[in-house]
Regions:
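Alpha-helical cap/lid subdomain in secreted, periplasmic
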Residues: 2-17, 26-273
Length: 273
């Protein structure tokens, strides 16, 4: 929803429809099973796929021989992903494909009463490596959430061992984690540095010297007061400060750790003379 909200505020005239074809608990095999009914029927032109968290499994960790279990999970994910690739390639309406490397399973955060599945994130990373290789081979887009989010978790845990962008169960990100992922996705699309709007007014001449993504009219400079009419073609992204459903993280927490505001949410006014 954060990605959709960014598009809506920054590109209000863009004819865009976004469909969620996923269901919680999915893995690559489920995506294959429901591709026709969930995806193809909607006739998308741009497809974003994410899997890995559930494909890496749960029950086989913290047991002797877990490495064999991990190998089996990766092999099965690879097999099912191969089937998914063929379904995607056969759908000629799909012009662009992006693969998302899963958010991490946080094995390091200190969470009371929550078991740590040691080695699970390494399995996820192996699946992500497979996704990256396929993306490069097929000319598809690729965004790796895992690496950056692991680095961010490490940073915040230096001062608070209970802090994480991966939620209260090591798996499901709170709103802060979702905001981080939205930032990484939008940055990968090349949107860093795109302003909401920028304008420069010369007060003495009562003239707009520069207008970017906006229009300035009716400039007045009277009684030590400058006034003008401002029409922007975009709106700033509203960063929420409220958690949901008993969780702790908010989008505001995320923008303290990633430069979303500086790179993607600047609305700048400059006045000279």
């Amino acid at each position: 929803s954060y990605i959709w909200l960014y598009y809506m505020t920054h590109f209000p005239e863009l004819p865009l429809r976004i469909y969620n074809g996923g269901i919680g608990g999915d893995c690559a095999s489920h995506m294959v099973f429901r591709f026709d009914s969930d995806i193809k029927i909607k006739k998308p032109t741009y497809l974003v796929c994410s899997f890995g968290m559930n494909d890496s499994g749960y029950d086989g960790y913290n047991k002797p021989g877990y490495d064999k279990y991990a190998n089996k999970q990766v092999e099965y994910a690879n097999t099912e992903f191969g089937k998914l690739q063929q379904q995607i390639l056969a759908d000629k309406k799909i012009k662009n494909v992006v693969l998302l490397g899963s958010s991490p399973y946080d094995e390091n955060v200190k969470l009371e009463g929550v078991e740590t599945l040691h080695g699970k994130n390494e399995t996820i990373k192996r699946i992500i490596e497979m996704q990256a290789e396929v993306a490069q081979k097929r000319g598809w887009g690729f965004v790796n959430f895992n690496t950056v989010m692991c680095e961010l978790n490490k940073e915040i845990q230096q001062s608070d061992s209970t802090a994480t962008f991966c939620g209260g169960d090591r798996i499901h990100p709170d709103k802060d984690g979702h905001m981080v992922m939205a930032y990484l996705f939008l940055k990968a699309q090349g949107l860093a540095g795109k302003e909401v709007a920028y304008f420069h007014i010369n007060a003495t001449n009562r003239k707009a010297m520069e207008e970017r993504n906006c229009r300035i009219t009716h400039i007045k400079n009277e009684n030590d007061t400058i006034s003008f009419s401002y029409l922007s073609r975009s709106l700033p992204f509203p960063v929420d400060t409220i958690p949901r459903w008993g969780t702790k993280g908010t989008a505001r927490d995320a923008v303290r750790q990633v430069p979303f505001m500086q790179e993607m949410n600047q609305e700048i006014m400059k006045v000279t003379d």
